[in-house]
Amino acid sequence: MPYIWENENWPEFIYDRGRADEIYTRFLDQKKNTDAAFSILDEVSRKRFHVMDLADDMVANLAIEDEHIDYDSVYSSVSKRLDLPLAVNKKSDAYADSICTMALDAINNHHPLTEERLNGWHRMIFENAAGLKPKIIGDYRNSVEYILRRQGREIEIVYTAVPHERVSAEMKKLLSFINNEENRKKHNPIAMMSIAALWFVAIHPYGDGNGRISRAISDYILAKGFCDSMKVFCISTMILRNRKQYYALIEDITSQKESMDITDWIMWNTEMAIQSEKHAVDSLRKTMMLTSFMKNLDPSQYNSREMCMLFKLADGSFFGKLTNEKWAKMNKCSSAAALRDIQHLVEKGLLIPSGDAGRKAGYYLNPEIGEKYGSTAD
């Protein structure tokens, strides 16, 4: 079976500059609208949205590979790193802290990307993780690497990565491309990110975790490319929503050796960035509608604890699943009083059950109330 790294022009990727520039202009137009929308927020609100988006993207980055992590732990870890006050401090989670460290290093550390830094990211992914781990952590693989697909009892080899003897040399070329300032002038940030991510996945330098690191590399390139802008768009979140297309595109491009053209890949990634910008604006709009609705609630129908908690839920100062225990702790009231408050808000349609049972039972703010009532709450 042929692979892209067998092409005689590897790794000289090519793409249609006209098409790429056209869709990139669309992205810049949308980004301008997004930046304008977020510019009206105060510093704390901007930081809160930034934390929420980062947490969403970190969880999505793992979920793309069917890896799971506790969202509340990630949100708590990011909040602490960015000095965002939390209504309830969640206990530290070593795995969430490691994933957070990698993600923040990718977007905030604009120093050149090195082999040592990538190996450090690899250690962060696996050292505190439960379950199966690759034999080698924090260094390149030393054996053949296959990408497999299971169909019932059948196992199909979808892709064979670059031979391990060539990995170190291939990675030096990739890192040189990423760190070369001339390439930043030659390619727009999304095109450059697309090239680097696909190139890395094609090499597949590690025994596991390559997809997660490829998306961290994407974040690094985008953050460096847009260093003067607010980072509110999250590529991994959009990839997760379109995961089948993502894997199909990678497979189509890497499992052949006739062409080095990656125009479709760059177009797709740019479209994901556009959708991510739109999603950020939509999330902001819903939150503002929700906050507006809360400000117009009749205080005579709710006690002070209920009003206080509703505002914390609406403006994001409390995030995650609300439990009876958390309510009692935050409001310094008895469990019985907390339960009565919560049940009252459920009856009013403001809280909805999480669907969990036993100790995991909890509640969330009803996401529909802002849409339903926000426009009439002015």
Feature names for model-found ranges:
Residues M1-D378:
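FIC/Doc superfamily catalytic core
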